[in-house]
Amino acid sequence: PGINYKNNGMTYHQLKYLLWSVVVGVTLSLTSCMKWDYGDAVEDFNATGAGLFITNEGNFQYGNATLSYYDPATKQVQNEIFFRANGMKLGDVAQSMTIHDNKGWVVVNNSHVIFAIDLNTFKEVGRIENLTSPRYIHFLSDEKAYVTQLWDNRIFIINPKKYEITGYIQVPDMTMESGSTEQMVQYGKYVYCNCWSYQNRIIKIDTETDRVVDELKVGIQPTSLVMDCNNKMWTITDGGYEGSPYGYEAPSLYR
């Protein structure tokens, strides 16, 4: 959203679709060449206590994402812990990490994978593959979770116990090329999700039916979503960029 393009006679939507096709084709090609095999040289870790995991996104298409661990008791940081514990690189663009069921779930966006790791040894205990471009994971139970996507008009439903994709939630009025679902919060049986890139809404999902049942219009491109201790939702919009056919406005904060 922060890039301006010269169209050289092409319409904006034609150019955008062309760029989207190239990006998807290249990333899928790169991913197909990426090896997930374990290496021989691995280290043994035994982290205890209340540590802090740090996802280091890396450079897009460079495959240099890493994971770090900070121990407040010793005030020491261990870098490259995933590589050092497993003997393989984490992948391309570490987007987010969520802790659930005594595992760390690391979402690697441009490698189309989520790794589950042991919180003490940092070793992989499972993975979910064949995702489009995963962003965030939200757990409904030990056997059900939602995964938001970029470049897809669906939210994936997964079974964390089996590390399997079990279904999809179709987002209304969203195409594949403009697809963008981002962060999620839950209140009761409903999950709320902000739709970010070229979108201006927060959708409401019934977790019993796995369907979008309502939506709330906000400013252009809500980038994040949180819920406070009073069960009030907050979102920040980036407003798009000048010259965007979707529009541009000042960033805003909504409650």
Language model region names:
Residues C33-R255:
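Predominantly soluble domains enriched in secretory-pathway, periplasmic, or organellar proteins
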